[in-house]
Amino acid sequence: MFVHLRNYTQYSLSRGALKVREIVEYCLKNNCPAIGISDFGNLFGSMEFSLSCVKSGIQPIISSNIRIEDENYSNCYLLLIASNYLGYKNLSRLVTKSFFKKKNNSFPSISISDLNNNNEGIICLSGGKDGVLRKTFEKFGGEKTSKINSILQNIFRENFYLEIQRLDRTNSELRFNDFILNLSNKNKIPLVATNENYFLRQDFYESHEALICISEQTFIDSEHREKISRNCFLKSPSQMIELFSDIPECCQNTLNLAKKCNILLEEKKTQLPRVVTEEDEDSLLKTQALQALENKLKYDPLKDKHKKEYHDRLITELEIIQNMGYSGYFLIVADFIQWAKKNNIPVGPGRGSGAGSLVAWVLTITNLDPIKFGLLFERFLNPERVSMPDFDIDFCMEKRDEVIKYVQKKYGELNVAQIITFGSFQARAALRDVGRVMQLPLTQVDNICKLIPYNPANPVSLKELVNDDTQIKKMINNDKNLRTLFEISSNLE
């Protein structure tokens, strides 16, 4: 049996092209009991991956390919796998540390010494083509590589594995593999076979190349760019077993390693920090909101004439907020926005559906009077809403860190985290970007994009379009470049 441990998903931003659902479907098709993801320097996909695997009866193996940088190493990686929940917490700490150490445009990275205090529950793989051992071996030779191996072995002990890969059978790869085999036998370190999986099938190679070119702002036909192997696709277990038929234990060890991993991430209910107050949160919010409304109306005689309308709307909103348990959330947001304004940090007027809240306006979370502009509170919050509402707040770019530090200090660093929003290719954007890296005429690509229906609420996929639109189907059947354009774009979409 064989378990893939190195899979780079789309969460390896602009580098990996594997989709989580594709990995799960691959496992079901090939009867794989377990599989891992190993995105570069992050754990963005770990929750989606874990939930999707468990739903399909597959054991998820969560890891990250962490960059190592210090006076001895540069641009090399270690694969760190969480074997249990403590390991996941330690891995999260290391990922966080890598971003805190990031300077200017450098890549997030850690040093070997950072592993000393955060290794419990973590399994370490020595790294593949860009691993610490391979890079050291190619630059300094076997003696120094053996010393680095000893350091890693001392840190991770029985949770340290040597990796062996067979991507292109180059002289460099063959020499290193011979060294690794000897090192494994000499030091009794288990050996695991891995493959660098960036895309699903071998025929997805061109699509992945286009993705890299889009990211690096270069062209597919560029001679001087670095290219990855065509073998960086998700091979079947039988293909991997055949590839390493002369050392079958390195495939069996992937299954043994998988058995050591026992972590299932679960979605948790929203837990907001409590507002420290003698009153309960509902009463405090109501008191503050009513007083703030009085202050707003007092200085505006036109609004004062509609006092009952404002008061009734405020009470209605407060009842909904209280019934849904979001009083504390409003108080927390109002607090750090008011703090920012008092400290001369520019704050935006408010965006999105949150601008429809009268409570938000009177508490100065937003600067827009929703009654004056006819904005609906129900778009922001209503009893039938499942997901938690959120305010879109803009802070001055140069001073936003001060606001974050204030919130961390008030509620505790362990209770504050930053979030990320992921963008994905839509049909037109995919065609334009792929057309550019293919160096197709801009007017030709633009004319094709005009044939794509624009419907953000219900976007049509390129595959659906090719099947349903006879004009587009005829165009790509008569032009090889256009056919390639649509094939690559639909894979990246």
Question: Which sequence ranges carry the predicted segments?
Answer:
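Alpha-helical scaffold/interaction cores of sigma-54-like transcription cofactors
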Residues: 1-493
